[in-house]
A protein has these predicted regions:
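Conserved ABC ATPase signature
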Residues: 141-145, 149
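ABC ATPase NBD coupling module
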Residues: 20, 73-90
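ABC-type ATPase nucleotide-binding domains, specifically the catalytic core motifs of the NBD
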Residues: 16-18, 108-123, 131
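Catalytic Walker B motif of ABC-type/P-loop ATPase nucleotide-binding domains
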Residues: 166-169
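A short, proline-enriched helix->beta-strand linker immediately N-terminal to the Walker B motif
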Residues: 160-164
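Conserved ABC transporter NBD signature motif
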Residues: 64-72
Length: 287
């Protein structure tokens, strides 16, 4: 069984906005094994980008546990955090051009991101770009590449130092369906070859199926997990509700709305299952 590469428990992140304290993450749990590809979904403001910034070493968590590839992100000094960002994690920002330097060629962009000697980083850069379908476009600048190839180049930059973990924020947002599928297919082969773990933030159902494991974040906590099984043409989804260490769960929003659940619910132990019911008017009345 693969080791746990990302281990977050009770993760809390609080920041100030206009003199108010905002709790962006409220005891979030997340466990990702080495070699996995996981999609993170959720509404705007749910905490997705905050989580990515913590895993990328950009922000330090306020409380809780966050360990990535043996690095304790809650106890890092600035020098260690800088080394972590450059050696252990690659981060693809939402806008692909934000990852690239416009005046450099495709090859130079990836070469610049490496930390190895000249001969080694030249070979690695060429290999990465070739595997990403850019082997014949090494001398072109980002502006001359179409959306799909810019994403491929940005992925090459993020993977340049051989990170254990690749983070990507909406990597297919700029692409049409066909182009996104082609990019993801090539990326899957490369991640498998490099044995790289990946976490993607997305609203794209295609990317969720590609990841085979999609985790929903709601109100700063992981709420549901969907696992996709079967062949690509006929995949089947199995959705589970995530329970934290205290036994707390978040019911899917669609269920709550359909049953008009508010404030209190009745739980019944029925053999090997628990049922959740709306109480009658008298039982549900507030004092």
């Amino acid at each position: 069984m693969n080791e746990t590469l990302v281990d977050c428990e009770g993760l809390v992140y609080i920041y100030k906005s206009r003199q108010l304290e905002v709790v962006a993450l409220q005891g979030l749990d997340l466990h990702v094994r080495s070699g996995e590809t996981v999609a993170i979904a959720g509404r705007s403001g749910s905490g997705k980008t905050t989580l990515m910034n913590i895993l990328a070493g950009v922000d330090a968590p306020t409380a809780g546990r966050a360990v990535v590839a043996g690095h304790d992100l809650t106890r890092m000094g600035e020098a260690e955090r800088d080394r972590y960002r450059h050696t252990s994690v690659g981060y693809l920002l939402q806008r692909s051009q934000a990852n690239l330097i416009a005046d450099l060629t495709a090859l130079e962009n990836v070469q610049l991101a490496t930390l190895t000697g000249a001969a080694v980083h030249d070979d690695r850069a060429r290999h990465l770009l070739d595997r990403l379908g850019l082997g014949r476009r090494l001398s072109e600048r980002p502006a001359s590449l179409d959306g799909g190839d810019r994403i491929r180049l940005a992925l090459g930059v993020a993977l340049a130092n051989g990170p254990r973990l690749l983070l990507a924020d909406e990597p297919t947002a700029e692409l049409d369906v066909a182009t996104a599928h082609a990019v993801l297919t090539d990326l899957a082969d490369l991640l498998d070859q490099l044995d790289t773990t990946a976490i993607f933030v997305t609203h794209d159902p295609e990317l969720e199926r590609f990841a085979r494991r999609a985790i929903q974040i709601r109100d700063g906590k992981t709420s549901t997990e969907t696992r996709w099984t079967g062949a690509q043409e006929g995949m089947v989804a199995d959705e589970l509700v995530i329970m934290d260490r205290a036994g707390r769960i978040q019911l899917p929003r669609t269920y709550v709305e359909k049953l008009a659940l508010k404030e209190r619910v009745r739980l019944r132990l029925d053999g090997d299952r628990i049922t959740v019911e709306r109480p009658d008017a008298e039982d549900g009345r507030s004092d």
